Amino acid sequence: MTAIGAQAHKLLGLKRPHRSFFESFIRTLIIVCTALAVVLSSVSICDGHWLLVEDHLFGLWYFCTIGNHSEPHCLRDLSQAHMPGLAVGMGLARSVAAMAVVAAIFGLEMLIVSQVCEDVRSRRKWAIGSYLLLVAFILSSGGLLTFIILLKNQINLLGFTLMFWCEFTASFLFFLNAASGLHINSLTQPWDPPAGTLAYRKRGYDGTSLI
């Protein structure tokens, strides 16, 4: 084998150092919990029925009146609930909550890509995914707070439905996974290819791309 061929073989065989089982387990757990949070939030928003007060069911999409022996009568036009600002406020709440799901999906994608395609940029991709989850937490919390503020006079702790608690749990998981992702990224050491390798030359001594 020629010297050039041997060097090329060495460069192709260069791999990232094997990470510990604990680190791999934690990163996998973060990805799984993030996927669970995305599912919970999506189902909660699509259903949208978050608060039951006596014979009234308040949601992101509908306002329903429940009779004693009749089917729920639901109105898509929330202005007919005779509550000032409810229609506009609910529109804002569901928009913010939906944006949280979108941010979380992109964050989840970055987390998965950083683990499947491991290279010198994996840590950066993981950090971006974690920050997107933090954005998802802020947006999701904003949607929950908007809903609570709009219906503060009707709120009863026992009146919150399962779908509301699903969204609350998803919001908490967004924060927990974002914080955990950033923390584990700060604990692990970045992978720098040995000097003289092709990957090192591409990055340059200051970390910038030369090719």
From Swiss-Prot:
The chain crosses the membrane at residues 25-45, 96-116, 131-151, 155-175. One of its GO terms (cellular component) is monoatomic ion channel complex. It comes from the Eukaryota. Keywords: Calcium, Calcium channel, Calcium transport, Ion channel, Ion transport, Membrane, Transmembrane, Transmembrane helix, Transport, Voltage-gated channel. InterPro entries: Tmem37 (IPR029372). One of its GO terms (molecular function) is voltage-gated monoatomic ion channel activity. Its main location: membrane. It is found in: Membrane. It is a multi-pass membrane protein. The L-type calcium channel is composed of five subunits: alpha-1, alpha-2/delta, beta and gamma. Belongs to the PMP-22/EMP/MP20 family. CACNG subfamily. Thought to stabilize the calcium channel in an inactivated (closed) state. Modulates calcium current when coexpressed with CACNA1G. This is Voltage-dependent calcium channel gamma-like subunit. It comes from Mus musculus.
